[in-house]
Amino acid sequence: GKYSKSIELYKKALSFDPNNATIINNLAKAYFDIGELKIAEKYCLEALKINPNDGNIQKILSLIYLRQQNYKVGWHYFDGRLNLSDFVEKNSSINLIRKKLFFGNKLKKDSKILVLREQGVGDEILYGTMYKDLFNKCENVTIECDKRLKNLFCNSFPEYKNSFVNLGEISNDKNLLSNYEIVLYAGSLGKYFRTKSAHFENNNYLYPDENSLNKAKEKLK
């Protein structure tokens, strides 16, 4: 198959350039894609030794550990995505908020926290499963969201509906941003609230507005 061919080519390239972290990481990714997680981990750690600050390597390593259900270590490396060029390009406010990005292991109850959505509506809905945990733990939370999802989030968390604002409303405004102590991207909430398999509940958490739902149903008739 194509993966066998890729692995063969990467190994050949590696024989000419054995300390090339990019080739080693590509090899790790190929093994990850075919489910050979232990081999993928071995190559990824090798690449990380050569280039410890490479976001691509950290991201692949995080996916390996998350797939292995080694959640604490997986989420730790998941923050590597914040340094990737495609992540930076799609998040225009990252240079404004970078100094406030939080990488600590514990969230304080009274910290003023701004949460930014991840790329894409699908990711935003996925990581939104942790918003309830965050609201329960911390008192001062504001969440920026895609404007298409704002009403849905407000309806799903009625007691916290004032905590949701449109994307960029705060993160693109230096003055408003100064009111917040720390900033987190939604995907980074995993290291605080999803560190065991038992933390992943299969419950519905999104509830559309009844009027909007009825109107949509009428249109489909």
Name every feature range the model reports, one short phrase each.
Residues 1-221:
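Alpha-helical solenoid repeat scaffolds of the TPR/TPR-like class and their adjacent stem/linker regions
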